C-alpha cells in the first residue's frame, strides 16, 4: 500500500471527512480537511471535534480574523510551508489567528509599519491587547508628526514608562560611548584622537570641551577681525574688530575647542582668534545656548565668542584661576581662587563678590550651593546673601541640586544626605560606604548616578538602593543625554498633561 505524506493527502483531498469554511467577513476560503489531523494539532479543533456537534458535521464554517492567514496555519498542520511574509499586517494577523486556534505564538520585534498604515496598525494592536511588547511596537512605529492627543489617556499613561528617554554618554580613554538604558548595551562608539583637558555639561545636545587633537575633524576657523590695540583685554572692552589671518596652517597637534554633537555623533573643532592671534583655550569653557555663544578661558582672560558669526565679542575680565562660570538672567557668575564674582553679562559691570574657598559650586534658579571641605553654604541669587550654612561631620565629596525634586544632595565617602531646597531641612540619609563614591550626577526623577572608582551606579534616592550598576574603570566623563525615544516620550507627556488639565 502506498504511503501518503500529509501534504499530498491535503492537496488531493483524499479521505477528507469535513469541508472547513474560513470566513473573515471579506473573504471565504474552503478547505477539505481531516478532523483527526486538526484535532491533534490544535486545542481549538480538539474541543470542536471532540465535544461539540461539529464532530459529526461534514461541513463547518468558522469566523476568523483573517481567512488567508488562518488557511496557511491549517495547512501547516499538514507540513505545508508558505512563503515567508514580512508584511506587518500578516505578522500581526498570524499572531491573532494562532492565538485563536490555541497555538503557541510569540510576537516578533521587527515590525515596521508605513506611516499611512499607522491607524490600521493601532486597531490591530487593540485586538491583540496592550502589553509591554505591543506598546513598544506603537512607540517604535509612531510617525514623527503624529498627534498623540487623539489617543485615550489610559493608553498614553501606559506608554510613558515603557522606554527610558535617556541614554548615558561615557568618555573613557578618549573614546566616546553611548550606553542605551533600554537595550543595556553600547549603541555608538567614537574614538577621539587627542587629549581632552576640560569638559562642560551637555547643553542643547552639545558637549563643549577643551582638547589637543590632530584629528582631521570638521574645522571652523573662528577668526575675528580686530586690530592689535594694546588695551583690548581690559575689563570694559566691548568688541574688537580683528582681521582674519591671511593664512592659517594648523600644527600637528592643536589646542582648541571641540564640540561633540550627541545626536549626530560628530565632533567639530573651533579655533578662536583675538588681535590676529589664535588663542589657546586653557581652563574653562561655558556654552550659552540662548545666544549660541561660548565663554573661553585664555591665559587668564575670560573671553566671549559668537559661534554663529565666528567673531570675538568682548573680554569679560581677568581671572587667572577661574574654575566655573554660569550665566542666568543677565548675570555672569565666575568662581576663582578669590571667591564668587557677579558681573552684569550685557555690560561687564561688576556687581558683587562673595568670598569662598571652594571650587565645588552648584547653581539653581534661586540659590547657589557651595560645598567647602566640611561646610555647606546656601547663597541666595536674589538677596546676594547667605541664607543658611551648616557643618558636615565628614569631608564633602560631592554636591548636587535636583530642581525637579527640590533636593540638595550632599555626599561624603560614607553617606548621601538629602535636604529640602525650600526649608533646607534634612529629609533622609543613605549609607553608600560600599560604593567608593567619586562624584554625583543628576539622572531622572528620584534617581541619581553615583560615579565610583570602578564604574557607576544608578541610585534610588527614596529607597537608598542601587537599581543598576555598571563596572567601567577610568571614566573621564559621564552625563545623561537625550535618547532615541526622548522626543516621542516628551510629546506623550505633553498630551497627558493637556488631557488632565482639560
Curated annotation (Swiss-Prot):
Segments forming domain BTB: 16-86
Compositional bias annotation for Acidic residues: 224-240
Protein name according to UniProt: Putative BTB/POZ domain-containing protein L89
Entry similarity comment: Belongs to the mimivirus BTB/WD family.
Higher taxonomy: Viruses, Varidnaviria, Bamfordvirae, Nucleocytoviricota, Megaviricetes
InterPro entries listed in its UniProt record: BTB/POZ_dom (IPR000210), SKP1/BTB/POZ_sf (IPR011333), WD40/YVTN_repeat-like_dom_sf (IPR015943), WD40_repeat_dom_sf (IPR036322)
Signal peptide location: none
Pfam families named among the record's database cross-references: BTB
Regions crossing the membrane: none
Chain spans, region Disordered: 219-246
Amino acid at each position: 500500500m502506498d504511503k501518503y505524506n500529509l501534504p499530498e493527502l491535503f492537496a488531493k483531498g483524499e479521505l477528507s471527512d469535513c469541508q472547513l469554511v474560513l470566513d473573515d467577513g471579506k473573504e471565504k476560503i474552503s478547505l477539505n480537511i481531516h478532523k483527526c489531523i486538526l484535532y491533534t494539532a490544535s486545542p481549538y479543533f480538539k474541543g470542536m471535534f471532540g465535544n461539540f456537534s461539529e464532530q459529526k458535521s461534514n461541513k463547518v464554517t468558522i469566523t476568523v480574523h483573517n481567512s488567508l492567514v488562518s488557511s496557511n496555519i491549517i495547512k501547516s498542520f499538514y507540513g505545508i510551508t508558505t512563503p515567508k511574509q514580512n508584511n506587518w499586517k500578516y505578522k500581526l494577523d498570524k499572531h491573532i489567528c494562532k492565538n485563536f486556534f490555541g497555538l503557541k505564538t510569540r510576537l516578533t520585534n521587527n515590525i515596521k509599519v508605513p506611516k499611512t498604515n499607522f491607524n490600521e496598525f493601532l486597531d490591530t494592536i487593540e485586538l491583540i491587547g496592550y502589553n509591554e511588547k505591543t506598546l513598544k511596537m506603537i512607540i517604535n512605529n509612531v510617525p514623527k508628526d503624529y498627534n498623540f492627543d487623539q489617543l485615550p489617556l489610559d493608553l498614553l499613561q501606559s506608554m510613558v514608562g515603557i522606554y527610558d528617554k535617556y541614554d548615558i554618554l561615557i568618555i573613557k580613554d578618549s573614546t566616546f560611548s553611548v550606553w542605551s538604558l533600554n537595550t543595556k548595551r553600547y549603541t555608538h562608539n567614537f574614538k577621539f584622537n587627542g587629549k581632552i583637558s576640560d569638559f562642560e555639561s551637555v547643553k542643547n545636545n552639545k558637549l563643549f570641551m577643551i582638547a589637543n587633537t590632530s584629528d582631521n575633524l570638521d574645522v571652523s576657523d573662528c577668526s575675528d577681525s580686530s586690530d592689535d590695540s594694546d588695551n583690548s583685554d581690559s575689563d570694559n572692552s566691548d568688541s574688537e574688530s580683528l582681521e582674519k589671518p591671511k593664512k592659517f596652517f594648523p600644527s600637528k597637534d592643536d589646542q582648541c575647542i571641540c564640540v561633540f554633537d550627541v545626536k549626530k555623533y560628530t565632533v567639530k573643532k573651533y579655533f578662536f582668534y583675538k588681535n590676529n592671534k589664535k588663542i589657546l583655550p586653557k581652563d574653562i569653557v561655558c556654552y550659552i545656548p540662548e545666544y549660541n555663544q561660548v565663554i573661553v578661558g585664555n591665559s587668564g582672560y575670560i573671553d566671549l565668542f559668537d559661534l554663529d558669526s565666528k567673531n570675538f565679542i568682548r573680554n569679560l575680565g581677568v581671572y587667572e584661576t577661574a574654575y566655573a562660570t554660569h550665566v542666568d538672567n543677565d548675570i555672569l557668575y565666575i568662581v576663582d581662587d578669590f571667591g564668587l564674582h557677579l558681573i552684569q553679562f550685557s555690560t561687564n559691570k561688576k556687581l558683587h563678590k562673595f568670598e569662598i574657598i571652594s571650587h565645588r559650586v552648584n547653581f539653581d534658579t534661586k540659590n547657589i550651593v557651595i560645598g567647602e571641605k566640611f561646610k555647606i553654604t546656601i547663597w541666595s541669587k536674589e538677596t546676594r546673601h547667605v541664607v543658611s550654612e551648616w557643618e558636615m561631620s565628614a569631608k564633602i565629596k560631592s554636591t548636587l541640586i535636583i530642581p525637579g525634586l527640590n533636593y540638595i544632595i550632599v555626599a561624603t565617602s560614607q553617606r548621601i544626605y538629602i535636604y529640602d531646597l525650600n526649608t533646607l531641612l534634612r529629609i533622609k540619609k543613605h549609607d553608600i560606604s560600599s560604593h567608593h563614591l567619586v562624584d554625583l550626577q543628576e539622572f531622572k526623577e528620584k534617581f541619581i548616578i553615583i560615579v565610583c572608582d570602578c564604574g557607576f551606579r544608578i541610585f534610588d534616592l527614596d529607597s537608598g538602593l542601587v537599581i543598576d550598576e555598571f563596572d567601567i574603570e577610568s571614566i573621564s566623563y559621564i552625563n545623561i543625554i537625550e535618547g532615541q525615544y526622548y522626543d516621542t516620550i516628551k510629546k506623550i507627556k505633553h498630551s497627558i498633561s493637556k488631557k488632565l488639565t482639560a
